[in-house]
Each structure stands twice: as C-alpha cells, then as structure tokens.
C-alpha cells in the first residue's frame, strides 16, 4: 500500500520520478504524458487538492458580438453568373404563373 508521504511535493520531482509514481499508482495512461497531467492524476488518486503547477485557465473576457446589418443587395451586380441564371429562371416562372392566373380569371 502506498502512502501520501512517498508522493509529497511531487511537483518538485523530476519527470522520471513522476512517471514512476504514476505507474505505481496505476494512473499512467498512454494518451497524456505531460508532467502536469501526471501530477494532477497522482493528486486526484491520493485525494490531495490540485496545485497550481499547471497553467492557470483564466477565462477570457466575453467579446461582444459584432452587429451585422444586412445592406440591400442589388439584384444583378452582387451575384455570380450561376446565381443570376437561377434567379432569372425563377422570375420567369413566377411571371408565367401570374400570366396563367390572369388568363384563368
């Protein structure tokens, strides 16, 4: 059985000592092997509060969202050739439909 006195001041030990301690406590994982990650796992396993050796995670100030205003777009100047064809086709279909409706009345 391991005691916490063996792993006291783990932050000041070398990387090799930390990895050995992590393997002893069965918290050494293949994915994250950074010194800070191993220290956190060891302290979590032993029930000690995590220290501030890891980089502090200060939350960034909330950035105000940019206000987007839609400017009226001109129909022909801002569209690509393909978009123009589609809109022209739709307009023609609408006009034909309106003419058919007028003829039916």
From Swiss-Prot:
Residues 45-105 are annotated as: Disordered. Residues 49-84 have a biased composition (Low complexity). It comes from the Eukaryota. Residues 95-105 have a biased composition (Acidic residues). This is Uncharacterized protein DDB_G0286463. It comes from Dictyostelium discoideum (Social amoeba). The lineage of its organism: Eukaryota, Amoebozoa, Evosea, Eumycetozoa, Dictyostelia.
């Amino acid at each position: 059985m391991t005691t916490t006195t063996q792993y006291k001041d783990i932050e000041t030990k070398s990387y090799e000592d930390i990895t050995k301690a992590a393997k002893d406590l069965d918290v050494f994982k293949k994915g994250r092997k950074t010194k800070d990650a191993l220290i956190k796992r060891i302290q979590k396993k032993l029930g000690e509060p995590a220290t501030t050796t890891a980089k502090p995670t200060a939350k960034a100030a909330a950035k105000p969202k940019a206000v987007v205003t839609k400017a009226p777009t001109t129909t022909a100047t801002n569209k690509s050739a393909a978009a123009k064809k589609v809109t022209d086709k739709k307009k023609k279909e609408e006009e034909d439909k309106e003419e058919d409706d007028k003829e039916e009345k």
